């Protein structure tokens, strides 16, 4: 493994939740492990505290940003959507922390990799909108995991194919044109954000991957959980390794 002094600092988005009367900021261990290997970066947890008046700008020190999945959904107010159905889980603190941070990272050309909720945050940060409940749309299938599955291997098993855009970034990184991916999301991209391009779609037309059009900026979002299962599949490993390479390049250029 590379010397720690040469490894990039990669911010990982945390979620705020409560346990009893105590608020917590949490990150699933699988995201931390994915940054340690195969990305070979140093994971830095970014707490969801911007709603409490924090003035810390994490883009000042990170060399990359990993947007994690979450049980929560982006609030419709962030993209001028209709109010959520009662009972929909939201994380106000994460929305107020991560969406502005994504925009600052794009301005500074800091590499970004978004997973599941992360691709949705990237799309909203770029001015796009979301389908709040894909499973309610007549021409779409249910992209959620089975509610009765509590076994990780079954929950994260491949659920459907995606068709990868020929000649696109994801195609160039992985060399693949069609693969099976897991599927654990209720929301999905509706209107594509500014300066984003489609990298992959599901059989029902739901956007499964996007990238930033600017060749000088690495920003890739995927709708599946590329970090799981472990060991990471070869297809997903290529994504993380490329992300790590982009983060190292950013860190080196920052020193110049």
Write out the residue ranges for each language-model feature.
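N-terminal beta1-alpha1 cap of cysteine-dependent amidohydrolase-like domains
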Residues: 1-113, 124, 131, 135-174, ...
């Amino acid at each position: 493994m590379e010397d720690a002094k040469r490894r990039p600092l990669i911010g990982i988005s945390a979620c705020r939740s409560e346990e009893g009367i105590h608020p917590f900021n949490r990150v699933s261990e699988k995201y931390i492990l994915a940054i340690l290997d195969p990305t070979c970066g140093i994971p830095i947890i970014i707490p969801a505290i911007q709603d409490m008046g924090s003035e810390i700008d994490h883009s000042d020190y990170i060399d990359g940003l990993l947007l994690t999945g979450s049980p929560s959904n982006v609030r419709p107010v962030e993209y001028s959507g209709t109010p959520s159905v009662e009972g929909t889980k939201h994380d106000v603190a994460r929305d107020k922390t991560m969406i502005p941070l994504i925009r600052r990272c794009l301005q500074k050309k800091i590499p970004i990799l978004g997973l599941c909720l992360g691709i949705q945050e990237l799309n909203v940060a770029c001015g796009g909108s979301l389908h709040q409940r894909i499973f309610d749309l007549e021409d779409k299938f249910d992209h959620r995991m089975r509610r009765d599955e509590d076994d990780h291997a079954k929950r994260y098993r491949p659920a459907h194919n995606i068709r990868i855009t020929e000649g696109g970034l994801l195609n160039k990184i992985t060399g693949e044109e069609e693969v099976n991916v897991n599927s654990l999301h209720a929301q999905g991209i509706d209107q594509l954000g500014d300066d984003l391009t489609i990298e992959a779609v599901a059989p029902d037309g739901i956007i499964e991957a996007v990238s930033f059009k600017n060749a000088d900026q690495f920003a890739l979002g995927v709708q599946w959980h590329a970090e799981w299962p472990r060991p990471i599949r070869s297809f997903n490993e290529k994504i993380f390794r490329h992300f790590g390479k982009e983060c190292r390049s950013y860190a080196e250029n920052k020193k110049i």
